[in-house]
Amino acid sequence: MGEQLKKQPVLRGGGFTFKQFFVAHDRCAMKVGTDGVLLGAWVPVLHARRVLDIGCGSGLIALMIAQRSLPQVQIDGVELEPAAAQQASSNVELSPWAERIHIHQQDIHQFAENHPHQYDLIVSNPPYFAPAIACRDEARDTARYTGSLTHDALLNCAEKLITEDGMFCVVLPHELGIEFARLAGQQGWFVRCQVDIRDRPGKPLHRMLLTLSRQAGETVYQHLALRQSEGVYSPEFCQLISDFYLNY
């Protein structure tokens, strides 16, 4: 490890300080949260060469993947909301991986139609609320509601952009994850890994991590409790976040 990485991170407001980078999110509708951290820490990066983050928000997941992946891996983040895209670009510029991450302020449908590259890893922390009740904040509405990007459209865009043997990874509320997997199956995707997540043992399942592929293969099913019964982080969750969270 270089001397730069041995220095203690400087704690700042308006965002979240990780061990190797800072994510400002004061201009983003969706803040740094457990869902994004889970996805960024969990996705399989070993064989990735080109990575796409759909709806990248503050750039959190792209930055986490950059930290975990090989130096030659290139990462594109696509974000529709202008303020979030600008903040993601700023976060990237201040990170150790500015040469590897590129933020595009663009609709993913246009990006999918016009972008020449295909990706062997695509990730997304997608919108999941139905648009029956609008948020007061238009940017937050875009970030949280499927009216801006339906799950059907997300799967279609991913199909256009993924390599033949690429992986598409998402995090969703558990019930919606079941529906997303069903919809994906109707569109020719195969579930290759499913992680059912609960806050602690005995509590209801509340999140799901999914890895999809266009290629059939064995499905791996796993379970994760974020905390132990007494409320402290579980060893499994600590292992996921140990390279990112301070004091772990």
UniProtKB/Swiss-Prot annotation:
It catalyses: adenosine(37) in tRNA1(Val) + S-adenosyl-L-methionine = N(6)-methyladenosine(37) in tRNA1(Val) + S-adenosyl-L-homocysteine + H(+). Its EC number is 2.1.1.223. Keywords: Cytoplasm, Methyltransferase, S-adenosyl-L-methionine, Transferase, tRNA processing. One of its GO terms (cellular component) is cytoplasm. The keyword tRNA processing applies. InterPro entries: DNA_methylase_N6_adenine_CS, SAM-dependent_MTases_sf, Small_mtfrase_dom, tRNA_Adenine-N(6)_MTase, tRNA_adenine-N6_MeTrfase. GO terms for biological process: methylation; tRNA processing. GO terms for molecular function: nucleic acid binding; tRNA (adenine-N6)-methyltransferase activity. It comes from the Bacteria. Disulfide bonds: none annotated. Its main location: cytoplasm. It is found in: Cytoplasm. Pfam families: MTS (PF05175). SUPFAM superfamilies: S-adenosyl-L-methionine-dependent methyltransferases. Belongs to the methyltransferase superfamily. tRNA (adenine-N(6)-)-methyltransferase family. Specifically methylates the adenine in position 37 of tRNA(1)(Val) (anticodon cmo5UAC). This is tRNA1(Val) (adenine(37)-N6)-methyltransferase. It comes from Yersinia pestis (strain Pestoides F).
